């Protein structure tokens, strides 16, 4: 389990280096502990593996003031475990259910046990700024548009394939639009007074 914890920690540290999430950001985690242990999703939930993943992932995120949502399995319609404070901050609707390893999954259950004031919410309303998918459980529905894949050097947590994504604001405009501050300042040069 120590190898799982270390891999999760390395992955989230690399993620945060590539995409520095600030205080108040929302990170979504989806994962299958069965896949982490080399089994097919849903066949071997493990609270021990779930706690190892969370021990690696949570501290770097929480130290930065990032809100964390942990996705439950399809039996709970991909509902998510969050802190009550997170639900309030993002206007999320609480649902009346308690996860367990066979209905919700081990990762959501472990998060519910670890969080200080946990609630389960129906959806993130596509407000997550970034996230990780451990084992191909699909988190895209929770991400803001536009999602951008992050290629990390950590490719697996245990035996589970690791996918990561950040998001960026939509690019709007047409042929004359610019998308960086540098481009904007260059365009402004033609409007500045010329020296005599």
Swiss-Prot record:
Belongs to the UPF0340 family. It comes from Thermus thermophilus (strain ATCC BAA-163 / DSM 7039 / HB27). Signal peptide: none annotated. NCBIfam families: TIGR01440 family protein (TIGR01440). It comes from the Bacteria. Pfam families: DUF436. This is UPF0340 protein TT_C0214. SUPFAM superfamilies: TTHA0583/YokD-like.
